[in-house]
Amino acid sequence: TGIWGSDMPDTEDGQTPTLAKLMQQVAEVVRPYKGWIRVLYLQPEGMTDELISTIRDTPEVLPYIDIPIQHCNERILKRMGRSGSTQELRELFDRLRTEIPGMVLRTTGMCGFPGETDEESDELYDFIQEQEFDYTSVFTYSPEEGTLGAKMSDQVPDEVKIERTQRLLDLVEQLGFVATARHVGERCEVIIDGIEESDEGTELIGHTWFQAPDCDGAVHIAEGEAAVGDIVLCDLVDSFCYEMIGEIVDATD
């Protein structure tokens, strides 16, 4: 995502298209409607100075960044056809947290890529533990026909891949629950995504700026009226797992 525009011709005024410029243009469009811009699937090498400053300085762009690293070990990344290392990734995330205070970070880790040793698996585990990402998706490597990885002879045994995956899942669940709980006590806008009916009554389901729809949990509101698409102001009063409990703020509060 971050390198969007690099394969496009310059504009009429001689500017090279970039994701940052596109985000600035979209921000102008959504500004009158108080819209949010959330950018997902940014690659580490695409995090340019221009992009970081645009995320920091454009109010419509949420301070939420999804950078799926897959791994942090340099050798494994090279085998994946990716660049980077633990130290380079550490420096990137340190910079992001410094330049965009309060930001939320999402990433992805892959377990059991061909040739991954116990030590390299531990390196990924330790890095994710160190970084305390707000959200981390974890996947088990699965060979796909025709890919470079599928042709590698040093496939990791399934039972080892499953063990490494479960170990990392246990970690990111703990980190995620703690990160979600940090938002208890905040007052923020919630976009209503749906309305659920049950024997216990009606519940509004929505998401906040720090929750990407359909992957980062939701806000559950037991009392109040709103339609899908409405934006309501809520107090976040409790959390469970990745979910939040919200109470709609009265207009007079």
Features from the language model and the residues they span:
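Conserved SAM/AdoMet-binding glycine-rich loop
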Residues: 1-121, 129-130
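Short, small-residue-rich loop/turn micro-motifs
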Residues: 2, 68-73, 140-145, 208-210
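Conserved, mostly hydrophobic/aromatic
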Residues: 39, 67, 108, 128, ...
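Short beta-alpha junctions and helix-cap segments that line functional grooves
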Residues: 51-52, 124, 220-222
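Short, cationic motifs built from Arg/Lys/His that form the positively charged side of catalytic pockets
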Residues: 82, 97, 144, 161-164, ...
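C-terminal, non-catalytic macromolecule-binding modules
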Residues: 119, 123-162, 168
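Terminal RNA-binding accessory module
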Residues: 151-253
